[in-house]
A protein has these predicted regions:
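Amphipathic alpha-helical segment used for protein-protein interaction
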Residues: 2-31
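Short amphipathic alpha helix immediately N-terminal
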Residues: 26-45
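Short alpha-helical "recognition helix" segments of helix-turn-helix
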Residues: 1, 49-54
Length: 74
């Protein structure tokens, strides 16, 4: 699967993979949102693949990513 073009939130820009994982795990996110953030920003999966793995719709993943971005900047 080709890596998706992912625009990283400001809080994750310039971080390597390990630092990104640590930042996501330390953010105030729930279990599902943490998994979505890791799949999107660390694994760089496209939304349909994340939707398939989490059993949410692609649209729901998009909405959740918007709130995840806000939580990462807290």
């Amino acid at each position: 699967v080709a890596a998706a073009r992912v625009v990283l939130p400001a809080a994750l820009q310039g971080l390597d993979r390990q630092q990104m994982t640590a930042a996501i795990k330390s953010a105030p996110l729930g279990r599902v949102d943490r998994k979505i953030a890791l799949l999107r920003y660390v694994e760089r999966l496209p939304l349909p693949d994340i939707a398939a793995q989490t059993h949410y719709s692609r649209t729901a993943i998009g909405y959740r990513l918007k709130s995840i971005e806000k939580m990462l900047s807290v």
